[in-house]
Design a protein with these regions (language model features):
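Hinge/capping helix and adjacent helix->loop/strand transition within the periplasmic-binding protein
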Residues: 78-85, 99-182, 186, 234, ...
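N-terminal secretory signal peptides and thylakoid transit peptides that target proteins
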Residues: 1-14
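C-terminal lobe and pocket-closing loops
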Residues: 205-272, 301-304
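An extracytoplasmic/periplasmic, membrane-proximal ligand-sensing/linker region
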Residues: 26-28, 170-172, 257-318
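Immediate post-signal peptide segment of exported/extracytoplasmic ligand-binding proteins
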Residues: 17-31, 80-85, 140-150, 210-211, ...
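Solvent-exposed coil/turn segments that connect beta secondary-structure elements
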Residues: 92-94, 120, 130, 204, ...
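N-terminal (or domain-start) structured segment
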Residues: 20-109, 157, 174-200, 208, ...
Length: 318
């Protein structure tokens, strides 16, 4: 079970938020989810429902997948001034993809107002149950011996799964064939159909591992996944890499601070609601609460780190 930190518990309000200004919210709030429906992305649908109850107004989840999770943030960045009725998930790719483009669609530090940091993902590599590979070491050895012959699905070019696999390939002399898709449900279907040899993704694959359809070979966290304690981490197999792709919610630039506070104060108890905590736990997603000020500072550091990584690896998308 995910156990929130003492600081986070003390920060959790005991009552519904005081609204920032008269009349807010005065219509449904759109929550942009930059992934396909299904799997791990659906925790945001539950969060929207719980936050809407706190606000006394419907929060409508809206899936806008594409461009490795950056189509949704691009829609938010287009708004010249936020009024609180449009928010969305900002995945780590929103810091990475702009650094890979000559003409990025948005500036992650100029075009968003940071509302609340939520969590991260548990990544891993899965194969079908009938795959000849029973361990990660076997798969990696085959990729080394057969460069470019082992294909893997990811949720998109520039995604955390893609970047990590390319780093593994480069550092271990094991070139893989990358096949990008739009999200977790697509990557799972690709593996089910035999279109790829394996999938590198966050825990959208959990139900299919639990029912025996897929086999989990390795996870990418600092420690073993709670749900799969028998599965080793990359570090345990000799690869010094940890990836968990932290994320939160943001509003458009220039959103009134009072509106940001009202949104935050509705989302914070929703984040810690036992029903939402149970869903995070189901997908091995860590609780990583940060308020607006702390999240803004974290986003600035993340933007610097991701830009440096892109330059170091020479990654381009145009």
């Amino acid at each position: 079970m995910i156990r929130p930190t003492r600081r986070a518990l003390l920060a959790t309000p005991l009552a519904a938020p005081a609204l920032a200004q008269s009349g807010f919210p005065n219509r449904p709030i759109r929550l942009i989810i930059p992934w396909l429906p299904g799997g791990v992305a659906d925790h945001l649908r539950l969060l929207a429902d719980l936050a809407g109850q706190n606000l006394g107004q419907t929060v409508v989840p809206e899936n806008r997948p594409g461009v490795s999770g950056t189509l949704g943030p691009a829609l938010i960045a287009q708004e010249p001034r936020g009024d609180g009725h449009l928010i969305g998930q900002i995945p780590i790719t929103a810091f990475r993809i702009p650094a890979m483009l000559r003409r990025p669609p948005f500036d992650p530090m100029a075009d968003f107002t940071w509302v609340i940091h939520l969590s991260g993902y548990c990544f891993g590599v899965v194969v079908r149950q009938d795959s000849p590979f029973t361990t990660w070491e076997e798969l990696l050895a085959h990729a080394k011996a057969n460069p470019g012959r082992i294909s893997y699905a990811s949720p998109g070019s520039g995604s955390s799964a893609h970047i990590a696999m390319e780093r593994i390939a480069e550092e271990n002399g094991a070139p893989f064939l990358h096949v990008p898709y739009r999200g977790g449900s697509d990557t799972a279907q690709a593996l089910l159909s035999g279109a790829v040899d394996c999938t590198a993704d966050s825990t959208s694959w959990v139900p299919l591992v639990r029912d025996g359809t897929f086999r989990l070979l390795v996870t990418w966290g600092a420690g073993r996944a709670r749900s799969f304690p028998e599965v080793p981490t990359l570090r345990e197999t000799g690869i010094d890499l940890v990836s968990d792709s932290p994320f939160g919610l943001a509003a458009p630039k220039n959103t009134d601070p009072g509106v940001v506070r009202a949104l935050h104060d509705a989302l914070r108890p929703a984040l810690f609601d036992p029903r939402h905590v149970e869903m995070l736990d189901r997908f091995d997603m860590p609780m990583r609460y940060m308020g607006p000020e702390e999240y803004t500072a974290f986003a600035r550091r993340l933007n610097e780190e991701e830009g440096a990584a892109v330059r170091r690896l020479g990654l381009r998308m145009d």
